[in-house]
Amino acid sequence: MFTQYVVVKLKAKAAPEFTRLIEREVIPMLRKQKGFLDEITFISPDLTEAVGNSFWETKADAEAYNRTAYAEVMKCLATVVVGTPTVGTANVSNSTFHKIAAAQTA
């Protein structure tokens, strides 16, 4: 399993709309992508920053999403996000939620 995380700065008072857009616009787009498994989104306590973690079957699936749908997702969020997102990737080594063990990624 592979994950991509995106860190964004939120516009003032935009957290509720950000959450709505993730639920109603972004997650349906992600579900259409090959290899998509899950999305978990966090918002900082002061409501100024959000982190989205998308989970993919393979690194290739995440890379394909980046080439095809990532720009559309960010366009959808343009009304609530400021600045350039920080993007990173990682192999998932453990997850109680997804029931995987480190041996599966070794």
Show where each model-derived region lies:
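Short S/T/G/P-rich N-terminal loop/turn motif that feeds into the first structured element of a domain
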Residues: 1-51, 55-71, 79-106
